Structure formats: C-alpha cells, structure tokens
Amino acid sequence: MEIRVEREISFRQAVHGRLLVDGDRVCDTLENGATCMKPGSYPLVRSYSLFSAANGIHRLGEKIAVGEWQYLGFLVRTQPVREQLLTYIRQLRHRQVPLVLVISEEGMQRL
C-alpha cells in the first residue's frame, strides 16, 4: 500500500504538502525544507516514526508533521491527526500489508 506525500508549496524553510493513502487525501503535511527527506520511495519500518505532531518546522529534522493546514509554516490539530494516521498504519501492519512511503515534489511551487 502506498502512503504518498505530495509537496505543494515551499516558502523559506517551510514545505507544505498533503498526505494520501492509496490516492485518498488524509491530511496536510509540513516539513523543514533544510532537513526533509529527498523525494523517492521508502519502505515503512517499525523502528522509527516519520510522522510528528509538531505544528511548526523547528526541531522536525527529517520527520513529517501531519495535521490541518492553518497558514504557511503552521499546522493545527496535529496530535489527533497523527494518532489517527498511526492507528491506521498499525492496523495495516497487523494485517501484514506492505507499506511504502513515496515523497513527490512534482508540481511544487516555490514562493
């Protein structure tokens, strides 16, 4: 199953996007442009969580903040959105569904 992050807007160090699971939009994303992962495909493994409940870009490192887009550089409802996403991922893992994270910058606007 594919979990996809489509990066849409880059403004200073903030990179906004959206997260899709098998093509269905689940939530918005926020990353630190200076430290975010390179575009590509990554198998999701249990040893490390890529998803964060942070509402700003500072201290994110390579993690991806999930939530609802409020304005450039800021998300809201990060904790409940992260918990819903992680619960869904745990259910898929329990059913032994292979998961891959795809990060795309196709069509990203730089402001």
Predicted segment positions?
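Cell wall/extracellular polymer interaction/catalysis modules
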Residues: 1-111
